[in-house]
Structures are given as C-alpha cells and as structure tokens.
Amino acid sequence: VIDFSFPQDVEDIRQKVRSFMDESVRPAWEAIDQSDRSQVVKTIVKLRKEAREERGLWLPHMPAEWGGMGLGPTAMAAVSAEAAKVSIGPFVLNAQAPDEGNQHTLLHWGTPEQKEKYLRPLCEGTARSCFAMTEPEVAGSDPTLIKTFAYKDGDEWIINGHKWFISGARGAKFALLIARTEEDPDIPQAANSCFIVDLPSEGWNIVRDVHTMSGGHNHCEINIEDLRVPAANMLGGRGQGHLLGQYRLGP
C-alpha cells in the first residue's frame, strides 16, 4: 500500500497555510470590491504584513538568509495547493508567479551586486518583476527559435524584438529578458543570453494586454526597439540563456 500522506512537518505547514487562508485571506478578499484596484492593493499589503510578522508565512520557497522559510518541493506543493484556494493567496505569501521563479533564478545565477539590487526588493515585497521569453512569431515553448536579438555596443547591449504573454509586465520594476546573442552557435541551445532590464526603459514598449479566456490579467505584448542594457546586467554567462530559462521554468 502506498502512503500518500505528508510527513508531519509538512502537514503542520499545510494546516498553518490553510488556517491563514480561511481565517484572514478569504474573508478579507470577499469583503472588498475586487474590481477596485486601490482596495485590492490595500488588502494585499495588510495581509502581507500579517503573513510576515504574525503568521511566519513569508517566502516559503526562499532560504532563511533571504527571509524565507526554506521549504523543499514537497512542502511547497502543499503550501501552493492551499494558497491557491484564494486567488490572492500566493501574492500574500510573496510566492506568486512570475516573481517566485525570478527569485530562484536570481538566487542561483545572480552576482552579489545583482542579488542586492534586484533580488532583495523582490524578497522584501517592495518590487515586482516579469520574465520575457515567449514570442508571437516563432518562439513559444521552444526558445531555440527566439528572434529577439541583442548585439554588443561598447559596454552596452542593444536589443530589438517582439514578446508577448509577458505576465506581470505592467508595473514591473525589471524584466529578465531572453534574447539571441549568437548568430551561429555550435548548438541551438547556446544561442541565447539573459538580461536584467530596468523598467520602465526607453525602447521597452507595452503594446497591449493580451486577453485570455478569463479576460485581461496583465499578460502583455511588448515591442522592443533599440533597448539599451548595461553589459553588467547580463544574468549568467553569454550563451547560457537557454539553460537559465530551463532552470527558471523548472519546479
């Protein structure tokens, strides 16, 4: 017989998250006008304070040295399942996409300077970010087909291209952007690199919010025209954008 029950320590955390959602998050969310952005923001800020200072439920996926709970994949699965029962649940725990994945990526790939400038605000909940990889013409789930191109110009990179379904782009303080930097790589998976793009920036143009079956939820189409990014903002090594992207999108 296979026992699918959680270890007791994971079950304790799951129940803790469930109680928070039932006692605080769901009632607060249902009590406001959810179409009123100001009410939504105030509610999330208040609940985040409770999560962090009273409940001990903050950054469940990040290590303790970054203010997190240091949970592994099994515990995170339990936490995510409970938090997702209320639409703002992951936001309240500072464990929402796309920031959660970007936090992992910056932690693993970032230089000390990049971590302090970009990861620290994400962990403190004072900034949001986005991940810009998907393109409308060719590169959806296959990043070897990315056409957005970056070329070196002194101590900067100049980037041109077209992205869409970039979740969280509107209001983000920075983007992790995947662009092609190699015209003739040895293998297709070595063509791309990743850049940290400060936002807003000249050359980063939000065209529209691409609606899904449930409406518009800040999944943006982006035109990128002569966008200049400092060379110091390359995340990981040149040609490692595919590897970084796979790490970013993994569990």
Spans of model-derived segments:
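Amphipathic, small/basic residue-rich leader segments at the start of a protein or domain
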Residues: V1-Q96, E113-R128
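Glycine-rich beta->alpha junctions and the first turn(s) of the following alpha-helix
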Residues: F4-F6, C194, W204-P251
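Short Ser/Thr-interspersed hydrophobic loop/turn segments at strand-loop and sheet-helix junctions
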Residues: G56, V79-A84, I178-R180, V197-E202, ...
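Short glycine/proline-enriched turns and hinge-like loops at secondary-structure junctions
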Residues: L71-G72, S141-T144, G168-K173, I187-A191, ...
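N-terminal glycine-rich flavin-associated loop
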Residues: L93-E113, D142
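A short, Trp-centered hydrophobic/proline-enriched beta-strand micro-motif
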Residues: G125-T134, I178
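A structural signal for short hydrophobic beta-strand segments in well-ordered beta-sheet cores
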Residues: T148-Y151
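A short core secondary-structure module
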Residues: N160-V207
